[in-house]
Regions:
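Membrane-anchoring hydrophobic helices of lipid-metabolizing enzymes
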Residues: 1-84, 97-99, 126, 280
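Non-catalytic C-terminal accessory region of glycerolipid acyltransferases
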Residues: 2, 10, 143-280
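Catalytic core of membrane glycerolipid acyltransferases/transacylases, capturing the structured
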Residues: 39-41, 84-138
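Residue-level signal for well-ordered alpha-helical scaffold segments within enzymatic catalytic domains
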Residues: 60, 99-106, 183, 187
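Short, flexible loop segments at the rims of nucleotide/cofactor-binding pockets, characterized by
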Residues: 61-67, 132-138, 170-171
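Short, well-ordered coil/turn elements that cap or connect secondary structure elements
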Residues: 65-67, 108, 124, 187
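Short gly/ser/thr-rich secondary-structure transition/capping motifs
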Residues: 65-72, 138-140, 223-224
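Conserved beta-strand termini and adjacent loop/short-helix elements that scaffold enzyme active sites
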Residues: 73-75, 114-116, 132-133, 243-245, ...
Length: 280
C-alpha cells in the first residue's frame, strides 16, 4: 500500500497535533513508534476492509480479523424502544469498544460511541463515532454533533474513564469516571445502562504504566502499546454483563454529579457477581 493511502500514520498524527514536537523527535524514535503500534500491519487490515464501514466494518473486525467471542449476559432485558446511555469500564483499549458496538448494534441499528478525535483517522468508524478532542478545545461542530445525537433516539455508548484501565493495588480498574454522562442523562432524559466488561491487558502494560508514573512522566506513553495489546487479545472470550437500566430521575440533588458517577462505577464493578442487582 502506498504511503499516501495510509490510514494510520504516526508521523502525520504528531505533525497535525504538534508540528514543533515532531521536529524534535529523532527519526529512529518515529521508526520505533511505527513498529510499536504495528503501523504496517494495521494499515494492511484497514486497506483490506476500506470498502465497508459502520456496523459492517465492526462485524468484520470483531468476528473475522480478531475473532473476539463475546459472552453476553443481561442484554436480553434491554428494551429497544427506550433511549439509553450505555456506560462501561475500559479494560482493553479498543476491541472491547468495537465488540460493544457489535452487541448493541444487533438490537439498535444506529449506535454512537463517544471517542477521542484521534480515532477519527479510521474512516470506516465515522458513522458510529462522536468525536471529542481531549487534547484541545472541542470545536463547535463536534459540540453540535454531540447535542444532535443526544437529542436523537440513537443509543449513546461511553467509556466514562476516557482512558484504559490501570492496575492499582493489585486490581485492574478504571481511573476516575468523568461525571459528564450523569449530566447528559438528566439533560436529555436518558436511562443509563451499566455494563461490566471482564477483560484485562498484559502484565507488561500495567508494569510500564506504573513505572512511567513512578518516575514522574505525565505523558500517557503506554498508549503506544495498545495495538500490541489488541493483537495479544485476539481469539479471546470476552464477557459482557449488562445491568438493569438506571432512570435519569435517580440522579437527583442528594448527590453531586461526580458522586453519582462514582456510585455508578462501583455498581458496574459489582455486576460480574450479580448483573440483576438494582442500583443502590
Amino acid at each position: 500500500m502506498a504511503d499516501n493511502s495510509k490510514f494510520i500514520d504516526i508521523k502525520e498524527s504528531i505533525r497535525s497535533k504538534n508540528p514543533a514536537l515532531l521536529k524534535l523527535i529523532p527519526k529512529f524514535i518515529i521508526n520505533y513508534l511505527r513498529k510499536t503500534i504495528h503501523e504496517d500491519y494495521m494499515n494492511d487490515i484497514l486497506d483490506r476492509h476500506k470498502k465497508i464501514n459502520g456496523l459492517d466494518f465492526v462485524d468484520s473486525m470483531v468476528h473475522k480479523e480478531f475473532k473476539i467471542n463475546a459472552i453476553v449476559k443481561g442484554f436480553e432485558n434491554i428494551d429497544p424502544s427506550k433511549r439509553y446511555i450505555f456506560v462501561a469500564n475500559h479494560p482493553w483499549g479498543g476491541m472491547e469498544a468495537a465488540t460493544l458496538l457489535d452487541i448493541v448494534g444487533k438490537k439498535f441499528p444506529e449506535p454512537r460511541f463517544i471517542v477521542n478525535d484521534i480515532l477519527m483517522s479510521i474512516k470506516s468508524y465515522h458513522p458510529l463515532f462522536i468525536p471529542v478532542n481531549k487534547h484541545g478545545s472541542q470545536g463547535r461542530e463536534n459540540a453540535r454533533l454531540m447535542d444532535e445525537n443526544f437529542e436523537s433516539d440513537k443509543p449513546i455508548l461511553i467509556f466514562p474513564a476516557g482512558l484504559v484501565s490501570r492496575k492499582t493495588k493489585g486490581k485492574v480498574v478504571d481511573l476516575e469516571w468523568k461525571k459528564n454522562f450523569i449530566s447528559k442523562a438528566v439533560q436529555y432524559k436518558r436511562e443509563v445502562v451499566p455494563v461490566f466488561i471482564d477483560g484485562r491487558n498484559s502484565n507488561f502494560f500495567y508494569r510500564f504504566a506504573n513505572f512511567r508514573k513512578a518516575i514522574g512522566i505525565k505523558a500517557n506513553l503506554e498508549m503506544f502499546f495498545l495495538v500490541d495489546e489488541l493483537i495479544k487479545n485476539a481469539n479471546s472470550d470476552l464477557p459482557y454483563y449488562f445491568g438493569k437500566p438506571i432512570s435519569y430521575q435517580t440522579f437527583d440533588k442528594s448527590k453531586r454529579p461526580q458522586e453519582w458517577a462514582n456510585a455508578v462505577k462501583e455498581h458496574v464493578y459489582n455486576l460480574k457477581e450479580d448483573y440483576t442487582r438494582k442500583f443502590m
